[in-house]
């Protein structure tokens, strides 16, 4: 399920030390108990949840590939006609392998996996990686999606700056979605994304991802950006696919060939 390209650095987190399962999760990811930590990890209904302690009214963050919005998108989201599918080159007879170099909560990776791609998620934040692994655990156990999830989705813990170079495998597409400051004040930004951004911070080194991504990808690199953001590392893409609020910048290295 999970590989690590680096030893996880110790990160402070609050959790109930009377629960051995929580203790084991935190030990695995190098998360040390800190009674003054801003964030708390809890288990709710067999699900690892991250709460922001100074904003108890906010809904906790967790990874759920089985139900909710992600499952709805899998069933009704437009299939291979979605912008992200077009961006990575999914088409008749072409199902590329993908490295998601900035996995986050795994939603885009899951969409691509549900459309047939083998996806390796790379996540450097140990708290987010713990949430992802827990989401994968529950997805792998699900009778509906478990079989293909086990085949198509895996997690690598490490910084993409080094992990992309260390993967040592051939991959068609590298997908990047660096954290970028939101300027609008939507409900999503106010709640879930605000919590997430306060945990992981801005990807200040995001420009440094393009070169290793281009070195690893055999076919193309796809960068998801807000519509108002500048090009990653100032490099103009070969083409763009635009949506209502975002765009996918596509850097082409070679043509996609049918299987």
Swiss-Prot record:
It catalyses: guanosine(1516) in 16S rRNA + S-adenosyl-L-methionine = N(2)-methylguanosine(1516) in 16S rRNA + S-adenosyl-L-homocysteine + H(+). InterPro entries: 16SrRNA_methylTrfase_J (IPR007536), SAM-dependent_MTases_sf (IPR029063). One of its GO terms (molecular function) is rRNA (guanine-N2-)-methyltransferase activity. It is an enzyme of class 2 (transferase). Its EC number is 2.1.1.242. Coiled coil: none annotated. The keyword Cytoplasm applies. It is found in: Cytoplasm. S-adenosyl-L-methionine binds at residues 107-108, 123-124, 159-160, 177. It holds the Pfam family SAM_MT. GO terms for cellular component: cytoplasm. Gene3D superfamilies: Vaccinia Virus protein VP39, YhiQ-like domain. Keywords: Cytoplasm, Methyltransferase, rRNA processing, S-adenosyl-L-methionine, Transferase. Its main location: cytoplasm. It comes from the Bacteria. Specifically methylates the guanosine in position 1516 of 16S rRNA. Belongs to the methyltransferase superfamily. RsmJ family. This is Ribosomal RNA small subunit methyltransferase J. It comes from Shewanella loihica (strain ATCC BAA-1088 / PV-4). The lineage of its organism: Bacteria, Pseudomonadati, Pseudomonadota, Gammaproteobacteria, Alteromonadales. The gene is rsmJ.
